């Protein structure tokens, strides 16, 4: 039995959707989708450390990500702590390299990394299938990142995944607009009218 770590570091990779079909909005507010996720080498870095007391703190470098309580890594950490009843706090240090609100899944990847990290800090009491349920509650991209798959076909709310073998490594060029925007607004343009 290996000892429970007091801190660890996880790379939280970006992704691209090689295709994306946004379907009808469901009663829960999420859209059904069909997509092909592909993991990229570009990654944020998440450090998680146990601390005395309770609660989750977040320190971010590299980009502004908004209020800590809205951050998916903080929400994910709280899900694991609440779900296990472990009476310790967590300090998260996030180094952002994935452009914020770019559609590359940075926040979702950070959330998946936090689920894995905090579960490890607690001695891995949450089984994989429950972590996937937590991931699905956080967002449509989070289950893919938690799965560890390099390539996956996803549908439903992103929680249904078919793992595929990785594509051959190839250089690529990804262009992002100079002026940031809200990628979620693009999703509303892709939904077919009722």
Where are these regions (language model features)?
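Gly/Ser-rich oxyanion-binding loop with an adjacent helix/lid
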Residues: 82, 86-159
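ATP-dependent small-molecule kinase catalytic core of the GHMP/sugar-kinase superfamily
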Residues: 3-11, 19-21, 25-32, 124-194
């Amino acid at each position: 039995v290996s000892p429970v770590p007091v801190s660890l570091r996880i790379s939280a990779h970006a992704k691209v959707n090689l295709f994306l079909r946004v379907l009808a909005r469901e009663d829960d507010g999420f859209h059904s989708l069909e997509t092909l996720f592909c993991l990229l080498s570009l990654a944020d870095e998440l450090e998680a450390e146990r601390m005395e007391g309770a609660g989750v703190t977040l320190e971010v470098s590299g980009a502004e990500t908004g209020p800590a309580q809205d951050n998916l890594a903080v929400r994910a950490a709280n899900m694991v702590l609440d779900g296990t009843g472990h009476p310790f706090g967590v300090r998260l240090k996030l180094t952002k390299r994935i452009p914020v609100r770019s559609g590359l899944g940075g926040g979702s990847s950070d959330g998946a990394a936090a689920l894995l990290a905090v579960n490890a800090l607690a001695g891995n009491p949450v089984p994989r299938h429950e972590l996937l349920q937590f991931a699905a509650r956080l967002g449509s991209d989070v289950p893919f990142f938690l799965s560890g798959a390099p390539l996956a076909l996803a549908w439903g709310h992103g929680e249904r995944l078919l793992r595929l073998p990785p594509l051959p490594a190839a250089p690529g060029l990804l262009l992002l607009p100079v002026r940031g925007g809200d990628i979620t607004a693009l999703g509303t343009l892709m939904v077919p009218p009722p």
